[in-house]
């Protein structure tokens, strides 16, 4: 059977939210308990996370076409992971500017100029739509130059690494890099012809 992306006639019916209770909240997220009616009219309690902001991530290249990655300990998985600079956009902040701000704060790097050739929107991914409304918008930036000192959050202990595109693709392929934003950024770049396979 061939499925056409424009044909949604066989999509499942959405759930109806009858009530929502905030079970926990801090500055980063809310844990919500939804009382929902399923398409067959059964009631169900569903736990979901709602983020405090919209995520942004930036995959940056220098003039030698090397890629800037970070290594940071992530307590959720109890590992040091490969990732791109990123964070949360502030309320009403332009997402591209939020990505560039996070890049500068975490690394001290910025593009030499902000043009359509040096800053490119790659796409948006859901972080985990099974239980969360959180998403991340991904940008690629070329011609990075060191522009200033880092201004990291107090809990950010990050090392910076310049890697080749070949190393990056192999690290994604082999599973050494597992971060969703890095994997998605590489896929977007390859699919749009912005990185050679």
Q: Residues of each region from the PLM?
A:
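Conserved Nudix-box catalytic region and its N-terminal flanking loop in Nudix hydrolases
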Residues: 2-4, 11-14, 49-52, 56-101, ...
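Acidic, metal-coordinating catalytic segment for phosphate/diphosphate chemistry
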Residues: 15-59, 63
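Conserved hydrophobic/aromatic beta-strand scaffold that supports enzyme active sites
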Residues: 31-35, 59, 69, 138-140, ...
